[in-house]
Amino acid sequence: MDNKKFLDFLKQNRIEPKNLSIYLEALTHKSYANEHKLTKNYQRLEFLGDACVEWVISNFIFNYKIKDNEKMRSLDEGEMTRARSNMVRSEILSYAAKDLGLTDFLMIGVGLEQDQSARMEKIYEDIFEAFIGAVAQDQGIKKVSLILEKTLIKYFREGQINYQKDYKTIFQEQAQRINKKPIMYKLVRNEGDKKEVHLVWNDLIYGIGIASTRKEAEILAAKNAILKLDDYTKKA
């Protein structure tokens, strides 16, 4: 790792490290640790970061207000649960790691360097949580909140994540009001970081999703399918 670039990265995120080694630990995969005979990897910090993310996001959601019938109100328990679940999904945390630029500093074993499978997406999720754990240990929970404001909370405010039911559930409920035919998510392309999924219902392709993970592609396919289903019901 280029320590100067990493220090610049921390500075861009308003972090003046008291203990640089804890951040390096947060970015060290066990394969790299094994190859270089290091005693530490990111797993313990990932455990801590997971708890920190949950607390900060739960606190944000608890205080979040929405406009409902011209009045502002808090989210109810079900909405809070869905919002938190949507905000900490694996693909969201993985995306946040890439968006923040953490993946540029990941230290990983030689055997995994060329791996473009879903396993890497899981590793990106892990280092995001581990980095949050490192920030919590070195800087405190307020700085963690600032990092999450730039990522997960920003995605929520911009509408990329919502507190309502996920797209797959919405499509399933709407489709089953019409008939009970099965909904299938077919993986039709699996090329490195490009997964293409077709949502098939009523013997028709209702939605297509392309993303870096199959799960995310299924969600996009369901989102597109909802629009097509709306047209179907309007014409019916």
UniProtKB/Swiss-Prot annotation:
Disulfide bonds: none
Binding site residues for Mg(2+): 46, 126, 129
Domain RNase III stretches: 6-140
Official protein name in the record: Ribonuclease 3
Catalysed transformations (reactions): Endonucleolytic cleavage to 5'-phosphomonoester
HAMAP family: RNase_III
Subunit structure, interactors included: Homodimer.
Subcellular location: Cytoplasm
Active site feature: 50, 129
Role, per record: Digests double-stranded RNA. Involved in the processing of primary rRNA transcript to yield the immediate precursors to the large and small rRNAs (23S and 16S). Processes some mRNAs, and tRNAs when they are encoded in the rRNA operon. Processes pre-crRNA and tracrRNA of type II CRISPR loci if present in the organism.
GO annotation, biological process: mRNA processing; regulation of gene expression; rRNA processing; tRNA processing
Organism from which the protein derives: Ureaplasma parvum serovar 3 (strain ATCC 700970)
Gene responsible for this protein: rnc
Cofactor: Mg(2+)
Listed GO MF terms: double-stranded RNA binding; metal ion binding; ribonuclease III activity; rRNA binding
Stored PROSITE patterns: DS_RBD, RNASE_3_1, RNASE_3_2
Keyword RNA-binding on entry: yes
